[in-house]
Amino acid sequence: TYAMLIQSWRMLLAGWGSPLGYAAAVRVWTIANLGRWIPGKVWSVGALGVLARREGVSGVSAAGAAILGTLLNLGAGFGILAVSGTRVLGVFRPWLQTAALAVSVCFVVGTLALPRMLPPVLARVARWRGIAGPDQQLPVGTLWLSTAINALSWVCYGLAFAALARGITPQLTA
């Protein structure tokens, strides 16, 4: 799953005009993720920007791609949850099923609208922070493919967890 997330990050970077080779991306991603063990949880994104800059990539693009990738990952996770678990959620509380479907619909609509919404939002944030925004707009296909990769990574997490559960729990016989 990390290989998929790294590739998704690379695609977002390349879409913003900052291509990075896969080996360098793995190195940057792996070292930056060590920052999650430092209290504050923001160190990973900062480290990602600094390490990517050492590789000749814009630190702003690297951090922005990491934040956007995280948002796409969270939305894809909610989407997978809604598709795979809405009936189970409805057993606990009927409104959870409706809420999960609503969140998933919002994510899909948001992902479809993202190519239109992202450029002005990024320009506003860049002006507010006093930094240069990305040199180019992310291609629509890159956003959607990155979202699909994130959804696939959630499916892989689920399959791995199912294999773990099956491997460590005794088989129930009828």
Language-model features and meaning:
Residues 1-30, 77-79, 83-174:
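Predominantly cytoplasmic-facing regulatory/coupling regions of multi-pass membrane proteins
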Residues 3-7, 38-49, 161:
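Transmembrane helix boundary and interhelical junction motifs in multipass membrane proteins
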Residues 48-52, 70-72, 85-92:
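Short alpha-helical linear motifs
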Residues 33-42, 70-82:
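Mid-bilayer segments of alpha-helical transmembrane spans in multi-pass integral membrane proteins
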Residues 10-13, 49-50, 63:
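Juxtamembrane transmembrane-helix termini in multi-pass membrane transport proteins
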Residues 22-27, 41-46, 53-70:
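Membrane-interface alpha-helices at helix entry/exit sites of multi-pass transporters
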Residues 62-73, 104-112:
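Alpha-helical transmembrane segments of integral membrane proteins, especially early/N-terminal helices
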